[in-house]
Amino acid sequence: ERGHISVSEIEMTHLPSAYIREEDDIKTGLGDACSYTITKKKNDIYYLDLLDKRGNIVVHAKRHNADVMTGMWRIDKINGNEIEDSDLEIVVDVPELKIHGKTGCNIFNGDIGLDRNKDWFIQFQNIIVSRMKCEDSKMAVERDFMVALEETEIIKRENGGKTIRLLDRNKKEVLLLKRIQQ
């Protein structure tokens, strides 16, 4: 896909950041851009190139593919073990980098970590859980669920994004999720 673009009056915060040089490069690139191309590569990875009037690439960007996770999910398996009568749910909000949900006993909230240099990468961080006491079997499932969330690093999409397998760094499945709603 190819098109034209015009960007003007660019403002940036310039708060202290490790990416400040990169932000200046992006600002300059946006100012010079007059056209763009969008390219789809393998595994549904999209790239945006902004081009100057001579056709030189001034900004090269990759769309992070974790957006497929945004929505409400039911947890069907933890570490390969089926969860019977699962009332474990997770709501993932990739644009806001937040998660929340139910463990079957407690509720939880946390943050999402993305690495723009790794395809299909996601981490769940800073997870906090309410402290209700439930029957031992529910507490064991909750504990396994929280550990699996913390081990997650890879998204594996199936069935058109209706099923997600979350894998650890060794590509072992830690969670199987089924979409409840977008």
Roles of regions detected by a PLM:
Residues E1-Q182:
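Lipid interaction determinants
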